[in-house]
Amino acid sequence: VLAFDYKFNSQWVLGAEIEFEAGGTGSAYEIENTENGEYEMEVEKGGEVALEQFHITRLIHPAFNVRAGHLIVPVGLTNEHHEPINFFGTSRPEGETTILPSTWHENGIEVFGTFGRGYTRFNYQALVVAGLNANGFDRNTWVAGGKQGLFETDNFTSPGYVARLNYLGVPGLKIGGSFYYCHNTGANSDKPETYVKYGNIPLRIYTADLQYKNKYVTARANMIYGNLSKADDLSSVNNHQSGGSPYTQTTPIAKRAVSYGGEV
């Protein structure tokens, strides 16, 4: 993994995180509409190189800045802090990474900043990103398989709206919450016509988390609650997906998902 920031000047910063893997992570699927909509895997996307982050930031004011590109989606505790030094186990927290994409990164635009001082200090992020793809939802991993990136292009038909707020007023303490909303996950499907008769299929995710660190102790806790509308209708469609697609056919898909955990 190669991660870096390049500062053009005091206002413009380029950030990137690039992965080099021998497994050909840059392969992608495409749909051959001239062959009855068959799925085919292609390697033109990049072979062994994959981008986890690649964005340009315009620094305007401590309380308001703008970033655009391929961004980490700050929903939950682990996505923002997915490096191994940020959890005690040998793998990422299972509850969070089972029901949400991890690491979750999408194309989009973000505004962020810090405001307040002393005991009233906060930071925030607000993003519009490519929404989750309903084709990838299933029984075992809920919406984790809906992250964009399987295909050569991402679908931005129904974007995801993300907001996060962190309280930073006490040294060593961080209390945060985030919200995700996509109005119609079915519209982001690679075959959206299969969901049209069910109308909009909205998804809402709420999270709360806490971290405390000093030289003697480190403690973390988080909770996630998600609600997927029309889960029964979605299950009936996903249960009949093509066997050649990159998706599973494991249904039924849960209407609600909950995860919580902590470590000290």
Task: For the regions a language model picked out, list residue spans one by one.
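Outer-membrane beta-barrel translocator domains and adjoining extracellular loop/strand segments
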Residues: 26-33, 47-49, 80-85, 136-143, ...
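Extracellular loop and loop/strand-boundary signature of outer-membrane beta-barrel proteins
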Residues: 37-42, 93-97, 147-151, 192-196, ...
